[in-house]
Design a protein with these regions (language model features):
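Acidic, metal-coordinating catalytic cores used for nucleic-acid/nucleotide bond scission
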Residues: 737-747, 765-770
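Electropositive nucleic-acid engagement tracts
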Residues: 585-589, 605-663
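Long, compositionally biased intrinsically disordered regions
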Residues: 785-956
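Structured, charged N-terminal subsegments at the starts of enzyme catalytic cores
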Residues: 507-616
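Short, conserved catalytic/metal-binding motifs centered on acidic residues
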Residues: 47, 613, 664-670, 737-742
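Active-site cores of enzymes that catalyze phosphoryl transfer or operate on phosphate-rich substrates
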Residues: 569, 573, 577-579, 589, ...
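Long amphipathic alpha-helical coiled-coil/heptad-repeat bundle
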Residues: 2-503
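Short, basic/hydrophobic alpha-helical segments
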Residues: 716-735
């Protein structure tokens, strides 16, 4: 394989420029000056000599020839004969390089050990670092095979040391129990370890207790007491991942017992965190569902009472009005007055009023308490978890301890002075009976809802979990922040003092508010009515006829292609399949399973499934499909493959013309679920109350998908906006981000702005949006009646450093972005309020600009339309079984969603490759194709793609 190295002009000037001394040295030592000079410059530039497989760029040879005042007709040939060796030795000595011998190998080994102590275990990364190190030491690089062998040897030794260290954290008596996890009880059974890999199928008491059992089993094994602090978290995560992918047979058959134990320990260590997060999610979800069910039941009862008592409320109204009018003139005694009305009718009216009042005042809580015995099926065990709390929740912790004693039988009833200050308002109103005594069941249910609230805010927490830790443990700690503060402010390009930023924002606010005020009389988009904005027209983006015609013309010239051929060709064009690596390091070189891997990707992306693809594909067996899927398809490998596809797409000139890289968008696409799944929920808008669904939330820029997340349709989308943007590892570099209206909160406006992604959502519910002044003394004419208040600037100023601390934590991935955003939304401390206040500044500026700037609105609509084009393609690809998921396993769902994004990106690459040819051809024919028209055409057209039928992999 021949390798041509790209050389920039700067590299030519630095490494390929010959000094007078160089020229004299070349003249004195060689007759073949260009060949000799090339070897010398190559060693200087890359730390090694030219090999027979290297191709020297013409620019470098031409540059050397000019300096040597010579000409050349062909590239020199570099051989390995004795004369060439002598020449290389002269060059090595002249440049002060040392040959790579045993001494240098030992030196490299010592250096590698120093890097391994820093927990750098990636062999590719270490090889690149070793090459840089050897060059800095002026040691001639050995062959890649030799270098790889040295690195592998040291890495394997280090990993073996880690295995021993990890295994020794567990007592020998407990280590023996690990073997039971990978040994089935009988031939047909699954090993217990396999059960721990599953995700919850539903949110109910049975599933809750099942996962509490799992956690207790891990706890009893002593895993939570293992001190792994000396092991780098990346090492633990890597070994834990192997525990997820190795099956029980592979683990049992491992030659190294220590490696087996280390993998299982790390897997259990990380799985315990996941299970705790599942338990908390289920706890909150069950309470949420119970509350929702109670509200629905109350709504139905309210309608029933209203129908039953139709017309019975008027007598009460007449009675009251008459009482006040006659009392005013003192015409009748009370007895005379009452006899004017029918007693039975009034009593019926009173009963109806009492029924309505009971429903409104305590109906929801009474219905929730009716589920008390159901909640008790798991709540006792939930309270045995090691819950901790911030200093302000002392009474809640005291109440938890009281309830634990009550559950254990240590006390018979709640004390009279039981704390109630922590209860949510709806429970405080109903906590006592008519005698003023605390109602135990109401108090206990109120406590559970208080737990839900405080866990969501991160003030009540489980320190052993991953996402439900103390809020301030998910961001920079106080000491690390003191050390990092100065550097992080510089990296974020944020001022140390808030007043510096406020000066800029004040000027921008005044400018856009003044412009919005001045243009309001002629604004045909919105008007002000009853103190709120109202749309006066549909401001949808109009696509010119020329664009429609051009789209049809390009579509008509697109070659017909089957989806499997498209995927194979896009993979070849981009080299993306190099991103797929096996989850284990094979003992010997294995052939890359190209066809089975392509078929497995399509099986997931089309929802056909592996067995379905095995039946529909020619040249592929089900065994090879399942092997390729299990060994190669993982979140990190699919993400890497997607990265390569997107980056290749950006190399086409037409990509710059057709797509505006300034914007990215994100949106959720709903898919029905045929199996029970803990993230699924009803989505009446599309599926009524008969079928549950989940959302696949994707981030798109220039048509390329760079983020894929599986979320619940019952959750707000806003927290997941930031996750995709911060985890983007492609060359896409959007400056603005857009979503639909439901995709934002004031916290999100603040965080996106401070992280360098100004937020431009589409506003559909403008009348429901509040905007605020930053200076209550300023007047903006007719706009004054829509302002909801004045932003507390002093609050932001006082908490500015803490705000930046959270922003820096998000930027550096200290915790998943959606976790921090969700906690912020539930917190009521001053820092959270300050972030919300800052978000109100940014949101107010944006809304005022949005209503007055038609070009901004159309730009936002255009990019969201491109995102919608990707949704249409995804719907077309994911066709089987009505696009419904038939699995309840989170990883399988995530694999399907990620492979769908991968194939979508493959379509983008393939289409762009051919659109480039078509547009070039049309322009050569004299067609005037404007870039502004191309930008209104999505490259994700798919009419030419054949998706259904038999899949032919035999000739790929």
């Amino acid at each position: 394989m021949h390798t041509e190295i790209e050389i920039t002009e700067d590299q030519l000037a630095i490494d390929w420029t010959l000094t007078d001394t160089d020229l004299q040295f070349i003249k004195n030592n060689s007759n073949q000056n260009i060949k000799f000079a090339t070897q010398m410059c190559y060693l200087r530039a890359y730390g090694r000599f030219v090999s027979k497989d290297d191709v020297i760029p013409y620019a470098a040879l031409s540059y050397l020839a000019r300096q040597l005042d010579q000409t050349f007709s062909s590239a020199p040939v570099f051989s390995q004969d004795h004369h060439s060796y002598t020449q290389r030795e002269k060059i090595r000595t002249y440049l002060g390089y040392t040959a790579f011998s045993n001494k240098e190998a030992l030196q490299l080994g010592e250096w590698l050990v120093s890097q391994l102590r820093k927990e750098i275990l990636d062999k590719k990364q270490l090889i690149e670092m070793a090459m840089t190190y050897l060059k800095s030491c002026r040691i001639v690089l050995p062959s890649l095979i030799t270098l790889g062998r040295v690195v592998s040897q040291k890495v394997n030794q280090a990993i073996e040391g880690f295995h021993c260290s990890i295994a020794e954290t567990l007592a020998p008596s407990l280590r023996a129990n690990l073997h039971h996890l990978i040994t089935p009880e009988h031939k047909e059974a699954y090993a217990q370890l396999a059960e721990l890999r599953t995700s919850p199928q539903n949110a109910n008491s049975e599933v809750m207790n099942k996962y509490l059992d799992y956690f207790e089993e891990i706890e009893q094994l002593g895993i939570l007491d293992c001190n792994l602090s000396a092991i780098h978290p990346d090492v633990i995560r890597e070994l834990a991942q192997k525990g997820r992918y190795y099956d029980a047979v592979q683990l049992r058959d491992m030659a190294s017992k220590v490696k087996q134990e280390a993998i299982i320990i790390c897997f259990l260590h990380e799985t315990a965190k996941t299970i705790l997060d599942y338990i908390v999610f289920l706890f909150k979800r069950i309470l949420l569902d119970t509350n929702r069910r109670a509200k629905n039941e109350i709504s139905a009862e309210r309608e029933k009472v209203s129908r039953k008592n139709k017309g019975k409320f008027k007598p009460a109204s007449d009675f009251i009005k008459s009482a006040f009018s006659q009392a005013a003139v003192k015409e009748l005694t009370l007895g005379q007055f009452v006899t004017q009305f029918n007693e039975a009718t009034l009593l019926e009216t009173a009963s109806a009023c009492e029924a309505i009042d009971k429903l409104e005042s305590s109906g929801v809580t009474d219905h929730i308490v009716n589920r008390f015995s159901y909640i008790r099926q798991f709540s006792k065990r939930f309270l045995t978890l090691k819950l901790s709390a911030s200093t302000g929740l002392a009474s809640l912790l005291k109440s938890i301890e009281l309830l634990r004693k009550l559950h254990a039988g240590d006390i018979k009833k709640l004390p009279e002075d039981v704390p109630t200050d922590f209860l949510p308002k709806m429970w405080k109103d109903v906590i006592t009976d008519e005698n003023g005594q605390v109602r135990a069941h109401h108090w206990e249910m109120g406590l559970y809802y208080a737990l839900k609230k405080e866990i969501s805010a991160g003030d009540l927490y489980l320190s052993k979990s991953r996402n439900n830790r103390y809020f301030w443990d998910t961001v920079y700690g106080e000491l690390p922040w003191e050390q990092e503060r100065e550097q992080q402010y510089l990296k974020l390009k944020l001022p140390n003092e808030f007043d510096t930023m406020m000066e800029v924002l004040s000027g921008e606010y005044h400018q856009v508010a003044t412009h919005a005020c001045n243009t309001l009389p002629t604004n045909d988009f919105v008007t002000i009515k009853d103190g709120t904005f109202h749309f006066t027209k549909d401001d949808a983006l109009v696509i010119p006829p020329e664009v429609v015609q051009l789209r049809k013309l390009i579509q008509s010239r697109m070659p017909k292609v089957r989806i499997e051929k498209l995927l194979a060709e896009a993979s070849r064009l981009s080299g993306c399949l190099e991103g797929f690596t096996p989850f284990y390091e094979p003992e010997k070189t294995v052939k890359f399973p190209l066809k089975p891997l392509l078929a497995a990707i399509l099986a997931h992306a089309t929802n056909i499934g592996l067995f379905g693809m095995g039946s529909s594909a020619i040249g592929i067996s089900i065994d090879t499909l399942t092997h390729a899927s299990h060994v190669y398809l993982r979140p990190e490998t699919i993400k890497e493959t997607n990265r390569r596809l997107v980056n290749h797409f950006l190399t086409y000139p037409i990509a710059e013309e057709m797509t505006d890289g300034l914007y990215s968008t994100s949106d959720a696409q709903r898919y029905p679920m045929e199996r029970k799944f803990y993230l699924s929920s009803y989505y009446p808008r599309y599926y009524g109350y008969y079928e549950k669904a989940i959302s696949i939330y994707t981030h798109v820029s220039r048509g390329g998908v760079f983020g894929t997340q599986v979320i619940s349709t019952g959750e707000r989308e806003a927290p997941f906006v930031l996750t995709g943007l911060l985890e983007n590892d492609t060359l896409l570099n959007p400056e603005f981000h857009s979503t639909d209206t439901h995709g934002f909160t004031e916290h999100l406006f603040a965080m996106l702005y401070l992280l360098g992604f100004p937020f431009h959502p589409r506003l559909k519910d403008l009348a429901e949006q509040n905007i605020y002044k930053i200076d209550k003394m300023m007047s903006y004419g007719d706009l004054d009646e829509v302002f909801s208040g004045t932003i507390d600037i002093e609050l932001i100023r006082a908490n500015w450093d803490q705000i930046v601390r959270i922003v820096a934590s998000l930027k550096n991935g200290l915790a998943p972005a959606h976790v921090i955003i969700q906690k912020l939304a539930n917190r009521t401390d001053n820092v959270s309020k300050a972030i919300r206040a800052f978000g109100r500044i940014i949101k107010s500026i944006y809304i005022l600009r949005y209503i007055a700037d038609q070009e901004l609105r159309h730009t936002v609509h255009l990019h969201l339309n491109h995102g919608e084009s990707r949704h249409q393609l995804a719907k077309k690809l994911f066709f089987l079984n009505r696009g419904a998921f038939k699995t309840s396993d989170y990883e399988e769902i995530m694999n399907k969603a990620s492979c769908l994004s991968l194939v979508s990106n493959a379509v983008l690459v393939w289409n762009t490759h051919h659109i480039q040819k078509i547009v070039d051809s049309l322009r050569a024919e004299g067609c005037d194709i404007q870039s502004e028209h191309l930008q209104k055409i999505s490259p994700l057209m798919f009419k030419h793609i054949q998706i259904y039928g038999t899949y032919h992999f035999e000739d790929i």
